[in-house]
Amino acid sequence: MAFKIASSPHVTRNLHTSTVMQRVILCLLPGLVVQCAFFGWGTLVQVLLAIIVALSAEAVVMKLRQRSIKASLSDNSAMLTAILIGVAIPPLAPWWMIVIGTAFAIIIVKHLYGGLGHNLFNPAMAAYVLLLISFPVQMTTWIAPSTVAMHSPSVLDSLQLIFNIGANVNMDQFRLGIDGVAMATPLDTLKTDLSMGLTRTESMTKAIFDGATGVGWFWVNLAYLAGGLVLLKLKAIRWHISTGVLAGLFIASSVGFLLSPDTQGSPLFHLFSGATMLAAFFIATDPVTAATSPRGRIIFGTLIGILVYIIRTQGGYPDAFAFAVLLANLCAPFIDYYVRPRSYGHSAG
């Protein structure tokens, strides 16, 4: 049998940062499209506004630091951060919120720590937490999905509400479902109903639910899952963190559901609600703020999944990924320290 022998050097080509970011952005698009389909044009407006703010802030900081503006903008990291913030916040949130959050992510969280590759926390999630703590009402006011909404916002409606211009529309009319009741997210609805003494089965008879999952949110998560799988296929991310996140959340929610099925959401509900798939494939996998070794990445991802379940069921914020990711970011150096690969020729430890 003849074997083909290639000439040296026997190396593989590493992906440039800009290429990786481009692939991540492209794989985000299916989720963004589905999210716009269910929650209106406001999401796209928020994303575009966030991109403008992020690129402007990046350019200003690079100018002040006397670094190359072109090189910094062309790595696409600021644009990716902007898109993640834009899809994470409610689609009709006031314009100044996305401006504050994006500027905070780029200027404070990213560049105050030294720029790309030096930040301790995920910039998008740090910005989300800042906005959530500072403006809890606006950050938890989502409109009803288009398929069960009494009224869906047009492009003009979205612009008027986001930029607070015109007086012929208000947020409340877009929160009403076809049953005439103001809607919250499935996670919010279930948590509120359980706190009022209703069972899971009773809560899930509401219009915001479709079987075991939430209306709209199942398809949004499915779209981000599809994009995430393509991202894995393109080798832009590794499988360890995403698998750890989903496994940790699945195991924790399965235990809770088996122990108390009347007061806990099912594993399927947790996996396809809120930002689960978005966070598992596009947020938690940030290589700068995550653990570095393969075993460390699995532990890092699993920790996020478990924290999400604990915060969702015991905390005050039903979609807990931002807090879980930031807490795991804090733990990443410790995970790397205690889960170091054994050096060749040396014993473990």
From Swiss-Prot:
Top EC group: translocase
Spans through the membrane: 37-57, 73-90, 124-144, 212-232, 239-259, 265-285, 291-311, 315-335
Function comment: Part of a membrane-bound complex that couples electron transfer with translocation of ions across the membrane.
Pfam family, one: NQR2_RnfD_RnfE
Protein name in the entry: Ion-translocating oxidoreductase complex subunit D
Gene Ontology biological-process entries: electron transport chain; transmembrane transport
Cofactor(s) in the UniProt record: FMN
Organism encoding this protein: Shewanella sp. (strain W3-18-1)
Assembly mode: The complex is composed of six subunits: RnfA, RnfB, RnfC, RnfD, RnfE and RnfG.
Compartment(s) of residence: Cell inner membrane
EC number: 7.-.-.-
Membrane topology: Multi-pass membrane protein
Modified residues (FMN phosphoryl threonine): 185
Key words of the record: Cell inner membrane, Cell membrane, Electron transport, Flavoprotein, FMN, Membrane, Phosphoprotein, Translocase, Transmembrane, Transmembrane helix, Transport
Similarity annotation: Belongs to the NqrB/RnfD family.
CC per GO annotation: plasma membrane
